[in-house]
Amino acid sequence: MKQYLELLNRVLTEGVRKEDRTGTGTISVFGHQMRFNLEEGFPLLTTKKLHLKSIIYELLWFLNGDTNVKYLQDHGVRIWNEWADADGSLGHIYGYQWRSWPDYKGGSIDQITEAVETIKHNPDSRRIIVSAWNVADLDNMNLPPCHAFFQFYVANGRLSLQLYQRSADIFLGVPFNIASYALLLQMMAQATGLKAGDFVHTLGDAHIYSNHLEQVKLQLTREPRALPRMEINPDVKSIFDFKFEDFNLTGYDPHPHIKGEVAV
């Protein structure tokens, strides 16, 4: 995944110093894009080991429309604990917006179901978009969405996905986001009878936190290895029927994990 290392290097060489909400401080650039062809392999970072279990369970949690950390904690995933209320609630974050976007009539819109149906029945549509950035609901979210919205594109029997991420923690968050949306693309492709095409990752404020600089420099000394493959249970036909056991990663040979503290 040289695209990712090129992003790290760009921010180190061109980035400007900025203060941030957490008080940690960052260096950042504005506007960057990476493209991953899923036919070439599953884009799971190899220059440090990632916790795939957390990525899969978080995505299933989003797709279930859940916004309480209990489901994640029950499966040993703690990545959302810092933002949860005492009862485990995170407010109207991703899963709520994806599956239950409030409409003006007092009902709700299931954006994922609508995306699936549009891909199947109107694949040339330029409106196959799922948004988590609900301006009217931001105050009801414990953490406003960093990966704000994504769009599907169908051509030549291939389904592609482009994500716009307004705020991108490059060292900790972005590797998770790449893998999560690449996996979502594979799942949606299977659920709609298409091949998985390109995942296009567009970043707004792409930043490295000041307490991750040494880790980033270490990572840049490592040579990327061959990408793994993600095998998905072919019997699953609905985007909502996937379980953790339906995913099998093969050929993953990463460099050792590099620890970094989360800026809350």
Swiss-Prot record:
Domain of life: Bacteria
Cited function: Catalyzes the reductive methylation of 2'-deoxyuridine-5'-monophosphate (dUMP) to 2'-deoxythymidine-5'-monophosphate (dTMP) while utilizing 5,10-methylenetetrahydrofolate (mTHF) as the methyl donor and reductant in the reaction, yielding dihydrofolate (DHF) as a by-product. This enzymatic reaction provides an intracellular de novo source of dTMP, an essential precursor for DNA biosynthesis.
Active-site residues, as the UniProt record annotates them: 146 (nucleophile)
Catalysed conversion reaction: dUMP + (6R)-5,10-methylene-5,6,7,8-tetrahydrofolate = 7,8-dihydrofolate + dTMP
Entries under PANTHER family matching the protein: THYMIDYLATE SYNTHASE, THYMIDYLATE SYNTHASE 1
Pathway(s) of this molecule: Pyrimidine metabolism; dTTP biosynthesis
Binding-site residues for dUMP, renumbered to this chain: 21, 126-127, 166-169, 177, 207-209
Chief localisation class: cytoplasm
Protein's cellular compartments: Cytoplasm
Protein name (record): Thymidylate synthase
PROSITE patterns, sorted: THYMIDYLATE_SYNTHASE
EC numbers: 2.1.1.45
Keyword Membrane: no
Annotated (6R)-5,10-methylene-5,6,7,8-tetrahydrofolate binding sites: 51, 169, 263
GO annotation (BP), single: dTTP biosynthetic process
Name of the gene: thyA
Assembly and oligomerization: Homodimer.
Alphabetized InterPro entries for the sequence: Thymidate_synth/dCMP_Mease, Thymidate_synth/dCMP_Mease_dom, Thymidate_synth/dCMP_Mease_sf, Thymidylate_synthase, Thymidylate_synthase_AS
Gene Ontology cellular component terms for the protein in this record: cytosol
Keywords from the UniProt entry: Cytoplasm, Methyltransferase, Nucleotide biosynthesis, Transferase
An annotated Gene Ontology molecular function: thymidylate synthase activity
Record-stated family: Belongs to the thymidylate synthase family. Bacterial-type ThyA subfamily.
Cleavable signal peptide: none
UniProt xrefs under SUPFAM superfamilies: Thymidylate synthase/dCMP hydroxymethylase
Key word Cytoplasm present: yes
